[in-house]
């Protein structure tokens, strides 16, 4: 299926030219020989014929008509065909919003796409910089390489035979936050030499999604991929059902394997069942090489979405891909995001007051650094980009105006009004509700985690991905796109950009140059995770989980 094109927007030119235009239907109706006869002077005729023509008034009228037509054609043919003010759809109003309201998503025919390919090719030739936006970074030949050490494989034999101690975990937060905790749960089970019971997904107080592990992820695939690393069971065996687990809620941030063994190994050996809660960011980012590889294996290979979610997500991605390249944005503009980040949407004073009131009623929702003002947070790069700021960023990065854009995320505070700056400059903007056929999303209407998984799939398959505000989904996709060959991932440099966003006197051309320069090294190129800088290996898989023969040859 093909996405709709906004035929009402003609290409802009650097200079406005006054001209008399001739409808393309007239020009096309003339054969090449007819045009040639009009443009080439006729041969001299005989004197007898001239006398006859001189005395015949009909010849005078015919000559006058041909001269007039010749003048009109000459003026028309001198005009750049790209600048002719004719829409590809003669009856189109050019209004995206009206067209979008009539039918969620209309799809152009294949023939229509083919008929315009030559004109679009010429347009691309006049705007060569547009191709740079879609250009992929050099992955330096890095590919996944998860070769575990001999000692790791030897230890696996004894760990997998152990069926008498079990680790239970409860993971909280949104889908991507839960995903990170599941990865760490597998690592902790390996460290403790315990079998892992399939993690329990805690119902989130904001989204209220009661989905279980198997509703979101492919459970059998999860077990099979990790069969050589950790023994995974769906539930406690009958011999342990009546056992009261030792519960722990106070695991410190960034705990090392040594700390976990020192504090939990005796307890799980004694009680046989250990229950852990609140695992978010509890496991250290700096682990032994084999455990880092296991982290990558869980995140990039074992945690595959359930078949039902994969099928729908792939369908929506195929609809975006049906006409070629597309960009995906993760927009964080929901009310709870503005509240939690201590930020303001900047739409109207009324919307700012809504956010401030909600934050005063629920101060516990504010995530960290509560002593900072909104302006301090904004300048520190701790606030999500607004739709206007995303638009200016895309223009500075030379995104084509006709780029097809998929935006992921929940309903923005302010609805369509919040997205207006983006839709005005980039009208081909879609989300999952626009792409889905009637009834396709209905089974998941109240499943926020499933909706997030669908967004994840469509964003993962895009040619370019840009998050408006970090977050767990952005981090997960950064690692996944790197693992898939370093597909383009643009990290907005908010802290450096924002002073220029606020400088109203800065010419747009200078603003664009500065912003583009800020992002030359933030396009998804391989980033070595050297030393112990605390970077998450699932976000930066080079070089523990990826290796390159080409890089070794260059060295």
UniProtKB/Swiss-Prot annotation:
Q: In which tissues is it expressed?
A: Highly expressed in embryogenic microspore and in vegetative tissues.
Organism's domain of life? Answer: Eukaryota
InterPro entries referenced in this protein's UniProt entry, alphabetically: FucosylTrfase_pln (IPR024709), GDP-Fuc_O-FucTrfase (IPR019378)
Q: Where is this region: Disordered?
A: 110-130, 525-555
**Any one GO molecular function term:** glycosyltransferase activity
UniProt keyword terms in alphabetical order: Carbohydrate metabolism, Cell wall biogenesis/degradation, Fucose metabolism, Glycoprotein, Glycosyltransferase, Golgi apparatus, Membrane, Signal-anchor, Transferase, Transmembrane, Transmembrane helix
- Pathway(s) per entry: Glycan metabolism
Stretches of Basic and acidic residues bias are at 529-555
UniProt cross-references to Pfam families, sorted A to Z: O-FucT (PF10250)
Listed binding positions for substrate are: 330-332
Q: Which residues lie on this side of the membrane: Cytoplasmic?
A: 1-58
**What is the membrane topology listed in the Swiss-Prot or TrEMBL record?**
Single-pass type II membrane protein
Coiled-coil intervals in this record? none
So which residues have sugars stuck on them? 111, 124, 371, 503
Q: What is its EC number?
A: 2.4.1.-
Q: When this gene is knocked out, what is seen?
A: Increased number of lateral roots and wider stem diameter. Altered cell wall composition with an increased level of de-esterified pectins.
Q: Which GO terms describe its cellular component?
A: Golgi membrane
What is the annotated localization of this protein?
Golgi apparatus membrane
Chain ranges on the Lumenal side, renumbered to this chain = 80-555
Q: Which GO terms describe its biological process?
A: cell wall organization; fucose metabolic process
- CDD domains referenced in this protein's UniProt entry, alphabetically: O-FucT_plant (cd11299)
Q: Which residues cross the membrane?
A: 59-79
- Function noted in UniProt: May play a role in the biosynthesis of matrix polysaccharides and contribute to the biomechanics and development of the plant cell wall.
**Family affiliation:** Belongs to the glycosyltransferase GT106 family.
What protein name does the entry list? O-fucosyltransferase 20
Question: From which organism does this entry originate?
Answer: Brassica napus
Q: Which gene encodes it?
A: OFUT20
